[in-house]
């Protein structure tokens, strides 16, 4: 086998590969053996037709396709390796010369991984990010805990007020015609929650139990249903019951009921400690994003369209999987959002291109710094992942499984973490 490489465009090369006539003839014999049962010639049992008779009656060309494919399978990978070519997609194959007793010559047009030209990535200046935990943040968390533990009681007298729960029957109309999904019975609506469209909830304030009212609203332009988007609607609403939330007192008894702490002060201290840690993690992630963005923006790389398209397909599959976990399909998603597959892919393309560039640039930094993952680091990462999904004896089994089946992914994670650490340590 011989292979010559020509660069024909940015990130595109053409390999001209020659397979020796002897090897091609061997491939023809294997093609004959593989397909022998398909040939029917009078005077011969099925599967017993000699090769020379097959060539006479059908022509030797009938054996070419399988023989050519076998030769390509055997030689294409070798040609890539010999010429240090990293493909990002399947090649475009063109057979140049083929014939019995002749060399097989074919061309493979290959889109390759792009070369990354790194800019400055060490000694960068990035504005530090930090978040303060304020007293009102803790008070809000306590208020949320109060609301979750509130007792709901029937309001015997009075009218609907903000913060009340109105139990309602409703039926919606557009142009005096009832629409699908616009009707509800005994629906508990918390006034002021913003869970209904427009100013629906505000219009119920002041109503008594048993009273009815026509509530006029307008659906948002991007509501998600073509027949409702931007349309004015009327809802016939009847208040059947009014409920109020009785919030528990914020005291030591409350702390004992909702946590493992004996006093309210201990509970508040715990909430603050957790908030500080959450803010530190948030700040760290934002700093990481800033550093990565700076490194990526300083680099230059021409990304092949094939890589972007592949990432878009990955994003679509990821969305489909997440929707499936919620019992939804892509088709339902398109209907709810008023989108289409083409629109969604077009929307995803910019993010896909950025992700591909980020991965390429960060890998180039890792390579430039000769950063490697040691066996100890791989095992530590495997243990970290395993502990998220198992415990005890099962953890050790999962560690072994990860080290064998997901070694490349673990290595990528470790290298990325070490690369980020190096970038942070070099910040001015």
From Swiss-Prot:
Reactions that this protein is recorded to catalyse: [protein]-peptidylproline (omega=180) = [protein]-peptidylproline (omega=0)
Function per UniProt: Involved in protein export. Acts as a chaperone by maintaining the newly synthesized protein in an open conformation. Functions as a peptidyl-prolyl cis-trans isomerase.
Protein encoded by which gene: tig
One Pfam short name: Trigger_C
PPIase FKBP-type domain boundaries: 163-248
EC numbers on record: 5.2.1.8
Source organism of the structure: Clostridium perfringens (strain 13 / Type A)
Main localization (coarse): cytoplasm
Entry-linked HAMAP family: Trigger_factor_Tig
GO CC term (a single one): cytoplasm
Domain topic, free-text comment: Consists of 3 domains; the N-terminus binds the ribosome, the middle domain has PPIase activity, while the C-terminus has intrinsic chaperone activity on its own.
PANTHER family reported in the protein's UniProt record: TRIGGER FACTOR CHAPERONE AND PEPTIDYL-PROLYL CIS/TRANS ISOMERASE, TRIGGER FACTOR-LIKE PROTEIN TIG, CHLOROPLASTIC
Biological-process GO terms, alphabetical: 'de novo' cotranslational protein folding; cell division; chaperone-mediated protein folding; protein transport; protein unfolding
GO molecular function: peptidyl-prolyl cis-trans isomerase activity; protein folding chaperone; ribosome binding
Enzyme class: isomerase
Subcellular location: Cytoplasm
Family: Belongs to the FKBP-type PPIase family. Tig subfamily.
Keywords noted in UniProt: Cell cycle, Cell division, Chaperone, Cytoplasm, Isomerase, Rotamase
Matches recorded under PROSITE patterns: FKBP_PPIASE
Protein's recorded name: Trigger factor
């Amino acid at each position: 086998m011989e292979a010559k490489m020509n660069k024909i465009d940015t990130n595109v090369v053409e390999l001209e590969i020659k397979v020796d006539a002897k090897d091609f003839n061997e491939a023809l014999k294997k093609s004959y053996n593989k397909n022998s049962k398909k040939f029917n010639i009078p005077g011969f049992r099925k599967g017993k037709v000699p090769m020379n008779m097959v060539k006479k009656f059908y022509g030797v060309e009938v054996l070419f396709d399988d023989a050519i494919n076998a030769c390509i399978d055997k030689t294409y990978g070798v040609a890539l390796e010999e010429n240090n070519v990293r493909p990002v997609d399947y090649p475009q194959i063109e057979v140049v010369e083929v014939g019995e007793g002749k060399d097989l010559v074919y061309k493979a047009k290959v889109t390759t991984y792009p070369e990354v030209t790194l800019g400055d990535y060490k000694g960068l200046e990035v504005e530090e990010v930090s978040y303060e935990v304020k007293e009102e943040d803790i008070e809000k968390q306590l208020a949320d805990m109060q609301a979750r533990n509130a007792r709901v009681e029937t309001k015997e007298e009075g009218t609907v007020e903000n913060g009340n729960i109105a139990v309602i029957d409703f039926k919606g109309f557009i142009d005096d015609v009832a629409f699908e999904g616009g009707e509800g019975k005994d629906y508990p609506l918390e006034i002021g929650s913003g869970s209904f469209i427009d100013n629906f909830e505000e219009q119920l304030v002041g109503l008594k139990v048993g009273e009815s009212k026509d509530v006029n609203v307008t659906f948002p332009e991007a509501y998600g249903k073509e027949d409702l988007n931007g349309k004015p609607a009327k809802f016939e609403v009847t208040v059947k019951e009014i409920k109020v939330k009785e919030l528990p007192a914020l005291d030591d008894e409350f702390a004992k009921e909702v946590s493992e702490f004996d006093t309210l002060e201990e509970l508040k201290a715990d909430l603050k400690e957790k908030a500080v840690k959450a803010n530190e993690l948030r700040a760290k992630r934002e700093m990481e994003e800033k550093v990565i963005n700076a490194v990526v923006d300083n680099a230059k790389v021409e990304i092949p369209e094939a890589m972007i398209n592949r990432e878009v397909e990955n994003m679509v599959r990821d969305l489909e999987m997440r929707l499936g976990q919620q019992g939804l399909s892509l088709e339902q998603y398109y209907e709810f959002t008023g989108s289409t597959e083409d629109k969604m892919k077009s929307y995803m393309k910019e993010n896909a291109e950025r992700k591909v560039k980020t991965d390429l640039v960060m890998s180039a930094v890792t390579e430039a710094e000769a950063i490697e993952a040691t066996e100890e680091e791989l095992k530590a990462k495997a243990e970290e992942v395993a502990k998220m999904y198992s415990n005890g004896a099962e953890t050790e089994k999962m560690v072994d499984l990860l080290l064998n089946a997901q070694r490349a992914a673990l290595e990528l994670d470790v290298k990325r973490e070490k690369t980020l650490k190096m970038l942070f340590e070099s910040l001015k």
